[in-house]
Amino acid sequence: MNRRFQFVVVAFSSAVVALLLFGAVGRSASPDAPYTNLGVYSEVLSRIKADYVEEPDMKAVTVGAINGMLESLDPHASYLTADQYKQYLKAKDSKKADVGLVLAKRFGYMSVEDAIPGSPAEKAGFSTGDVIESINNVSTRDMPPAFAEQLLQGDAGTAVEFGVLRVAQTEAKKISVVRASIVYPAVTGRMDGQTGVIQVQGLMPGRVKEVAAQIAALEKQGAKKLVLDLRHCSTGPDEEGIALANLFQDRGLITYTLGQKSAKQEFEAQASKAVTKLPLVVIVNRSTAHGGEIAAASLLSSKRAQLVGERTYGDAAIRKAVTLADGSAVILSVAKYYSPEGKSIQDNGVTPNVMQAEAELAAADGAADDNLPDAVPDDTTDKKPAADELMKRALTLPEK
């Protein structure tokens, strides 16, 4: 598909979304309004087919329109053709090698939510906010997120070619990453003076038990305070984030989910699952997502912990694959996770009560760092000095 035709598809799909969502303003009482908008959609489709300067690929137009609708509503949604959906189901249960990227759709293209610590992608220099213009020379502009994830998988030792855009770059940088088996980092614990430091870089099943074991070990070593480092905690089931919060929180609401057709479901802390009452500081960054930010939101809202760092990524939703008549499928967010005080974590993230810039200023008078949470980071993001200052601030933060 040439660039001019891509533009037509994108513009067309955006117009369709506007018509379907907002075309009924002023006549919303009419039950026929949505069908009127579909009539306009059909008319636009016929005009493209009849009048466009070149003979259009109508299948591409339709797929582009569907992707445009989904992206406008939910950047994490995907439309998969029947063949793509079969591949998706097969890939879900496979143990193929990977490059270790967590992806999301931002700015119309795929972007990096996180590079799993120790993965080939992290070693290749990927960081949160990198915009991926292409994967294996295929543009990600109209690529469903679920399909992009499939392209990352393959046989160990084979390469994936990326076109990556960063701040101050006018052309995509070509990066080749070799697939390997992904080993998710184990939970680690250490003493720093009288403070126990626990690092969690992912919440794969079993990690919460590891955290509980580290808490017990650190308390035996005389810990009077705990620091829970959730930077780059972006993988694993969301439910693990709820279980993680419950280790520190013995009462009250942890989170709840709610969707248009999903009834509100509350998750309360259970006293029997809490394992410590020590003062707590949690560190987060832009790569903290899913269960990590669910736990962070709960511990901050309940005043169980202070939160230090950057605003988290903002990806905490329940997604469901809906199969269509022709065997294709739509993957949609059907419910969002909310903080106990009612703030949606999805797209908003969790804002610390001590931001990174404050931590750096506390470490060195006159240090200047605007560090806007939603700016696209450049190659200097997440370098060791900034990370060290966050840890120093967490270690010295007075109890509330």
What are the language-model segments listed below?
Residues 2-77, 108-110, 400:
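Terminal targeting/pro-maturation regions of precursor/exported proteins
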